[in-house]
Amino acid sequence: MSNLSYHEQIDRENILKLRGLVRDLPPFCSDFFRGIEPRTSSRTRIAYAYDLHVFFDFLHRENPMLSKLEIRNISLEHLDQLSVTDFEEYMEYLKYRCNDKKQEVMNKERGI
């Protein structure tokens, strides 16, 4: 491991972090991350994983159809059933929410 450059060490740490994040998402998300791997940095993929976690957490907490499912059990078929209203509610949710650490998160229009 000591033969790795600084950037290689950071990339390795990011890859391990991403694996942990993807493990908590629905299985089909793994295909997405494998697909974007050649054209994105590990830090970009981590940011996408956080964004997907926020989205699926919203569905799990706020959507009556999906609230009884664990996040890992949400399927593409479930996503196909979402309406425009569901996405509008998600966009509104992004303006103010509490994260997993019970910290308040506020986004302005530019951050959504």
Segments predicted by a language model, with ranges:
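N-terminal core-binding DNA-recognition domain of tyrosine recombinases/integrases
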Residues: 29-43, 53-112
